[in-house]
Amino acid sequence: MSEKNSKDVILIGAGVLSTTFGTLLKELAPDWNIKLFERLDKPAIESSNERHNAGTGHAALCELNYTVEQKDGSIDVEKAKEINEQFEISKQFWSHLVKSKQIQNPQAFIRPLPHISFVQGDKNVNFLKRRFEALSPLSMFKGIEYTEDHEKLKVWMPLMMEGRDPNETVAASKIDEGTDVNFGELTRKMAKNLSEHDNAELFYRHEVQDFSRRKDGKWEVKIKDLKTKKVEHHITDYLFIGAGGAAIPLLQKTGIPESKHLGGFPITGEFLVCNNPEVVAKHEVKAYGKEPEGTPPMTVPH
């Protein structure tokens, strides 16, 4: 094995995590050498693909699980503030990439879209109203609106109100400054930008199989070229595992203490696509509901 294969950083997976981290390294440490390995034949095919996630610009504008009701009935907004700040930083980073001409055509991956929280029943309506009152004074949630009026709700979200019982107890809050994000397109743009970096190489159809830690602290990574069936060994100072569902098994192969006592569980979901323009035109919002009591947050209808 030759030391000529030695690189500073190896990124595993070509989804939004690895391409984002690689892009950050390109900006902050342009002299570092980067190798990205992806098992499939192009970036953003699995979890980052636009058909495999909700495409929400997560800023805690409509996601109710970030504002938790306390035992005394108050609403804790600290997590919502944290999430909102993090998403603002993401938008600033993407803006920098556009302004520096590293990625083009931003409207292909992000666009403005009102975010709505919608609830049903007296208990949930009471919660949403208190959430609205807790968020309203905060500048990051400026412009949030609240209503229980069916006629106003028909203006906000006509498709969701169509055929609904006019006596049903419902409520919604709305913020117009929400966003819809095509994480698949964003990932593809960052992968292309990274591939044009002098010190970066992207390898598709390459499967990372194992790791071993050398005495000098570096990592030896066993990688199989799925096209040629050849097994390669690469030496690197740092590893970044952004491999979606394969991340935990790969992390466990490193043997590091942080890999212990971790687990995952499968989540199944279904995204329905409407190709009827007349129906689509009635729903120009991102709407999130509230999960049924006693169920995990990923059961939120949206």
Where on the chain are the PLM-derived regions?
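Helical element adjacent to the flavin cofactor pocket in flavoenzyme catalytic cores
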Residues: 170-238, 243
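Flavin (primarily FAD) binding-site architecture
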Residues: 241-256
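Glycine-rich FAD pyrophosphate-binding loop
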Residues: 26-50
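Dinucleotide-binding Rossmann-like beta1-alpha1 core, especially the glycine-rich loop
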Residues: 55-155
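Central beta-strand plus flanking loop segment that forms part of the substrate or channel wall
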Residues: 59-61, 257-286
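FAD cofactor-binding and catalytic pocket of flavoenzymes
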Residues: 281-302
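N-terminal Rossmann-like FAD-binding beta1-loop-alpha1 element of flavoenzymes
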Residues: 7-35
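Conserved Rossmann-like nucleotide-cofactor binding loop
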Residues: 17, 42, 246
